[in-house]
Amino acid sequence: MIADGGDLDALKSLASQTKVVLSTAGPFARYGSLLVQACVEEGAHYTDITGENHWVRGLIDKHHLEAASKGIRIIPSCGYDSIPSDIGAFFTISQFDKPVNRVDVYHQAQGGASGGTTETIFTMDGVGKEMRDPFVLNPENTVSEEQREKSKDGFSIEEVDGLEGWSGVGVMAMANTRVVRRSAALMEQNQKPYGKNFTFGEHGLFASKRNARLASLGLLLGFIVLSTPLKYLVRPFLPKPGDGPSQETQDKGWFRATFVAVSEDNDRKICSMYGSGDPGYKSTAKLVCESALALARSNDLPGGEGYGGVLTSAVGLGEVLVNRLKDAEIEFKVLN
């Protein structure tokens, strides 16, 4: 089946002939809106690999209620952004039989740069306010003052208790934290709540204090350049759409996310999620394909057959996806 991405009727014809649509065509704010509309109107589930939370906020506003009423699951952000953070937090919280107060994730990864991701940065002018809102994806009236106070963006360089490393800037924290917070809010509304005033933080993990300082400084400088008109000066030197890491880089890549969770009575657990293959390519392909297959083949998704809306991987796929990822050689471990 072939459909022009700008032709709603063609996209509706495509969506009407399938159960699940998986999209990897970004920037999604440019290419994805009509496709999601077609899926909602024609009754197809949807998943993608976006990290564009301002766009996802628009999907929630436009389509959540209709998708919910039809039992259609629209699940963005099912690549490296944001499954390790979202499903990893879900897995970690599932190890408790009591409410969890906070989870912090510490990311490590090795891989290459993507031209598609670079292009996305250049489509995000004018959305800074939305991107900076820690709860941009939350439903209305789901954030307490305590949660807001403990969820401000920022970072610290300090040795992490129980882990062999130092914390620093989390590269995709501003994308991933918002997704996990939406998961927590939807769990509170529809499934098993994480905890009354649950909060979530995301960080990089580095081998030494010096490495944490240098990497965090470099990342902050990069953020400054790419969030100002200076980005147009460096654009010729950045990967272009269609460019990506070599096969060797993809094969040698990996990611590890380590989660430190504390319950409301101060019980502490440490869990991890590990995948081999470049995070943005090989691992992302595995994560999003398993998400789509879960939507297509599973009859025991969380919430039951009639549950839908603009969801997250934790809320819409949950334990089904954890088990599929385990079978696909993504490792989940309880470390203490």
Cite the ranges covered by each PLM segment.
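Conserved Rossmann-fold cofactor-binding substructure of NAD(P)-dependent oxidoreductases
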Residues: M1-V20, T24-Y31
